[in-house]
Structure formats: structure tokens, C-alpha cells
Amino acid sequence: RDTDRSRGLGDVYKRQNYHKRNKRYIHEAMRFDLLKEDPYKGERFSRGKHAIRKYLTAEELKKVKDAQIDSETICRVRDLFVFQAYTGIAYADLAKFDFKHELQKRGDKYVILDARVKTDENYFIVLLSPAMEILRKYDFVLPKITNQQYNLRLKIVADYAGFDRNLTVHMARHTFATMCLNNGVKMENVSKMLGHTNVRTTQQYAKAVSYTHLRAHETDQYL
């Protein structure tokens, strides 16, 4: 089961981190002549497989969008998450971008052209109808929230949506990536939209269920 697999991968990463920390301490001890040789010398440890990317299915995203939320604060958090799920924009880039003044228009679509905060890599996003609806709702000035508060309040959004698992900021971005790839958007174009420095990073999103909310040509024709 996915849960068992995720738990197994988690154990692998815990072991990797444990040995990584140990090696650091050992090398420091050797530097001060407190230890004569490295006990790890000659040892090889499995790096394990990439963790499975967590994303929402079409049905799950619809539950988030349609959830009846009686708190304005939590409603704003839900809107931010849905906006990210339809754009793939990273949290730091979302917080930085001035949607009121920096959006560009190409044909009948609005687009984001910017450089990522994390890597300074250029990215390009075509804003689809659900994302535009949210922007117009807030008059192109999206709510501001810290990353920590965002993740905390997403747990409440998950409760409203009836999920037995948490939502996270990164899950929105992963949802966008899988929805694009499963609707035929070219890998290199998804990579451009996400601002990945290497297309291999994008390939990690390739295992996902079919999505019905996005037509590939809506983005491909602009790239």
C-alpha cells in the first residue's frame, strides 16, 4: 500500500540522516585527533528511492474547492491553495509576485513571467480560468500569510474537505505538475512552468492519475 511504502521510504531517509550526522561528528573528531580512523571507511549505504510526490486527484481538488467554509481566514487559505494547484507557483514566488502590476497578456490569456526566489531560474505560467477567478475575487491582490501559518491552516482546510490526511503547501505544486503531465503537456514545458533547473526533477511527478481539469493545448500553445 502507498501508506506502507511511504512509511518505508521515511525509515530509509531517517537512517540516511542518522549516518550522515554520525559521519560529520566522526570527521570532526578525527580533525582534532580524538579518533584515529573512520569506522565508516569502506561502508556503502543504500540511498533508497525518491519519495513519492504527494498530490491531489481531480476529485480531491474539487472537494477542496467546493468545501463549505464558515471562516473567512480559512477560506482565504483554501483559495491560495487552489490558486497554487492551478498554477504550480511556489509559495515564495507567490508571496513575491505583484499580480496587479506584473501580469502580462498573451492573446486572451494572462501569464506570469518571473524568476524563482529559490534558484533564480526563469519560469512561465499561463493562468487558467480557476486561477483567474481567484485573482479577480481578490482584485489581483492575493492574501498574505507566513509559510508556517499557511501549513497550519491547511490542516483545517483538509478537515472541511473531509480528508483524513493533511494538506501542505508543496502538495498544491505537485498537484499542478501531475495534472499537466497526465493531460499531455510536454515534460519540458512543465519544467519551464515550475522553474526547474533540471528536467529530471520534473520527471519525478510523472506517476499520477488522469486529470480532467486541464487541456494540454491551453498551456503548450504559449510556450
Question: What is each residue range found by the language model?
Answer:
Residues R116-D120, L194-R215:
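Catalytic-site neighborhood detector that most strongly recognizes the C-terminal catalytic loop/helix
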Residues K23-I26, M30, S210:
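C-terminal flanking helix
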Residues R116-I156:
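C-terminal catalytic core of Y-nucleophile DNA break-rejoin enzymes
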Residues R1, R7, P143, V169:
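A Lys/Arg-rich helix-loop hairpin that forms a DNA/phosphate-binding surface
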Residues N17, R76-V77, D164-G184:
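Short basic/aromatic active-site micro-motif
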Residues Y18, L35-Y91, A95:
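Basic, Lys/Arg- and aromatic-enriched nucleic-acid-binding interface segment
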Residues D2-Y13, H213, D220-L223:
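Single conserved hydrophobic/aromatic residue that forms the stacking wall/gate
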Residues V82, Y86, D93, R173-T197, ...:
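C-terminal catalytic core of tyrosine-transesterase DNA break-rejoin enzymes
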